[in-house]
């Protein structure tokens, strides 16, 4: 009897205590999309509160009194207000939060596979916003990347802070992603920049440094993650039409055309709209170029559609498709420097007719405990036919990834884990008329923890298993990073990460020719490994309503068994003319450097202004410089080939009433080292060269290049604008990749309408 009496008294006391409290409940959603925000925090000034669950709802109790209620979420404007609570009261608070578009609160996902403020990341990350892509009328993503500090693209080959040189179209150390899924070709791991839907990009995130622990083999030097746009509560439709003309080169002797000037023309369309629980984003693009290179052209058409259906607040499914057809010719090297810089050497021009497609089904599910389960899949078909079947190539890549993520709200930690599998099948005479298959399986784990609300620690590992043509290899890679918030907008970071890259099918087994030059296989090629480390500080600043981050960093990268396509003399190949390209393990390398950058946006007074500026210095060397490496390089000193030691990037844009004016300035120092066989005579003490005039051109152009672009737009009204865009404004004759000139001055007229 006493036991039951005690239970009754205890129950009455609980009821009495509860009755002395107030209950706060509600729903937090996105102001634009109306979607529930998972993990938003709702707290009172007495330190009671809760985080929203998988459906955006929350509930907690608080003693009676007058308090300040604060609602916050990463990347959104914080809301605070006074609230008066009485005993036994039930208060329902349904709030919407607006995204904070200021650069100081930019949110990224690539560094940790979950949303995190840019300043809190432990690695260097730069972000390209949609407005820069739209306003510059860049037709390929690599054109936009050239504006970013520390990033260089040499004839389609991206390198970050000198992590790679020029690979002749195979074996990227920078992983290109689209919506977190790889979009490198299955056979050669080469990025197809023109395949990225420029008309449907939300933002591009660039990680500088080894990222293999999260993203695998090709992320040895960093990643570029393209995040496509989804609709908001307001439907949006855009049309762009443009037409441009190339001017005569400054050296008029190089002009091969008469009155029929080379030109570009194109149009794009994008539409994004919500239909209840269904999201639709779609776009299309057509492009036609008669090139400034003689007999060269590029025609392509692309269409894409992204869908998402929210079955309920816990489960979303979707299907994304991007497809492109193209016909083009490609330029390899010039015919001479007197009047042939824009004319291909006989037999080197190649015709291509291709079809590319990605098909991406996905599922995103939150279980009852708020854990996220994500399944990503991709089919990437890349079919390329050439004028001769000996260089045609048909490859298909199948990719799948399962991600699991758990937030530990009570200890401010996030656990991310996943398994990955991919399979590639290649049918091509390009690889000795043999069918090749390759596979990759991996598991990864990352743990992020915040201490004292200021110190972020991130650690992770990945175990990779690769196989190609019967060769199997497995290896673990690790990463560790820290970020300390020293003041409101002052972040100090340090990171270390390992990298690993397995050879591609192209690097090991390619067997073809370009005119008289061979491209030779190397079945004995071995994997390269490495690591990169960085220490940096990111300082936020405000001038009136203009916001910016100033970033200062120092970095070091080391690679073992670095793979590079090397041009040289290969008598063991058993061909009549044994000059050509072969992928070799060139040894151990080290790259030291530093970088300072400023990225800002906002208003100076009443003038909206954006700024991207940066200077990068690298010192790329062999760890052990021997006579063989010296013989393969055009430089006598210890320096890696195809790098710029100094680069400066600058892009600024301001809007004054109805006029928007922008300017881009890029500086590249002289490329000090290229393949020796490119510049040395075939027969010593003669004037017979494989690439005619390259050494003379390098002798005459050895001070670096400064390139200026300019754009002016007239804003007719809120929906219409007309732009004039001039690239290479000073009409400089220059070359980024040896033996291939860049474009002379181009003037483009663009009409854009937003409905």
Task: Write out the residue ranges for each language-model feature.
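Short, acidic, small-residue-rich periplasmic hinge/interaction motif at the N-terminus
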Residues: 29, 33, 41-43, 72-76, ...
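Flexible loop and strand-edge segments within Gram-negative outer membrane beta-barrel domains
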Residues: 289-366, 372-373, 379-397
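Short acidic/polar hinge/loop motifs at secondary-structure boundaries
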Residues: 59-61, 181-210
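Short, acidic Ser/Thr/Gly-rich low-complexity loop/linker segments typical of extracellular
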Residues: 47-57
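Extracytoplasmic beta-strand/coil segments of soluble accessory domains associated
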Residues: 61, 125, 142-181, 185
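Gram-negative outer-membrane beta-barrel transporters
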Residues: 240, 453, 555-558, 582-677, ...
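A beta-strand signature from Gram-negative outer-membrane beta-barrel systems
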Residues: 195-240
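Membrane-embedded beta-barrel scaffold of Gram-negative outer-membrane proteins
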Residues: 241, 374-378, 382-384, 485, ...
